[in-house]
Amino acid sequence: MPAAAARRPAKAERTRAAILAAAERLFARRGYAATRLEDVAETVGVKRAALFYHFRDKQGLYDAVIEDAFGMLAARLDEAFSVPRPIAERIERAVEAWVDAIVARPALARLILRHAAEAEEHPAQPLFPAAERLLRVAFSLFEQGRTSGELQPVHDDPFHTASALIGATVFYVSAFAALLPPGDFDPLAPEQVAAHKRDALRTVRRLLGIGTPRRAAERTGRP
């Protein structure tokens, strides 16, 4: 009896994990509004009522998917930002962590796009609980680096750099291959990921003036 009792929680956890995985794929592919709980249940192979054992409703399931999916990303960025190294190196580590996390879990990129596309339905809702905190940490490092001279940014605010990095990786992972003839390009192939990461680092270094002096033309906005 004790062994059987011990197996029940393990089975429940496996079922919950399967529900989260199925819901993540469906939310990423269809968006929140178009994803039905019946579809999630059918994908997992359980009855719709079984979902409510683990999640209070559809919104609760979506919130759990977001927390689970972005928890890994938040942990990697926290580690990169908190390492006791120079600001420029911490930012570079964060860039690498960002690319690695999105590539490792491509649904993250699609969830970001879906969240942006459905922004009118949740104008004040952040993408995931740690998003605003992580942005504050990144922007604080930007200001510290600019004040100390360790960073010589092209722009006086960090939004252009954040947009260039986030937009490039999200589009690269979630949408770029769809615009090409089938089979011509695999964005998740190791050599392509390595190339994208190098490009991302070069872009961020260029925009933040890491390792290169800031030119007068950049300060005045001239080409």
Where are these regions (language model features)?
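Short Lys/Arg-rich basic patches
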Residues: 5-9
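Helix-turn-helix
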Residues: 14, 18, 22, 26-60, ...
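C-terminal peripheral helix-coil segments that are non-catalytic and often amphipathic
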Residues: 1-3, 100, 104, 132-148, ...
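Short, basic, alpha-helical segments at the C-terminal edge of helix-turn-helix-like DNA-binding modules
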Residues: 67-72
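Amphipathic alpha-helical segments used for helix-helix packing
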Residues: 103-125, 175-183
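Hydrophobic alpha-helical connector segments
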Residues: 64, 78-108, 155-165, 194-197, ...
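Short coil/turn segments at alpha/beta junctions that flank glycine-rich nucleotide-binding fingerprints
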Residues: 29-33, 84, 105, 148
